[in-house]
């Protein structure tokens, strides 16, 4: 396996929302997230649990664009990669809030079966390592 890229997750609220520094600041609020198997949603749930707070309803949404639109309209909050927000041309209706590193810093890995490290997988690995300029985490005999 190798790290494909690192992401920064941020909490987003409507632009009028006060600063968020801990889970209690948004306790009981509606959150928009992907299904419960989403690792980003799990980070959000861990942040609440470890902060001793409880979110309100968690509404499942199937796209970042819909999630951001709901947040911009003041319907709730969401967690999203900062790179997704960088693609949005008008961010004036949302506000971003940093998360502590253990919740906000994530790595996405390219993994492959030990018996299936094909030339195509190697080419993908090399392309990702070159594009994101990160050293390989392990050799081609990975998991």
Feature locations, PLM:
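A late-sequence structural motif
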Residues: 21, 95-138
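Short beta-strand/turn micro-motifs composed of small residues
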Residues: 13, 33-35, 61, 112-114
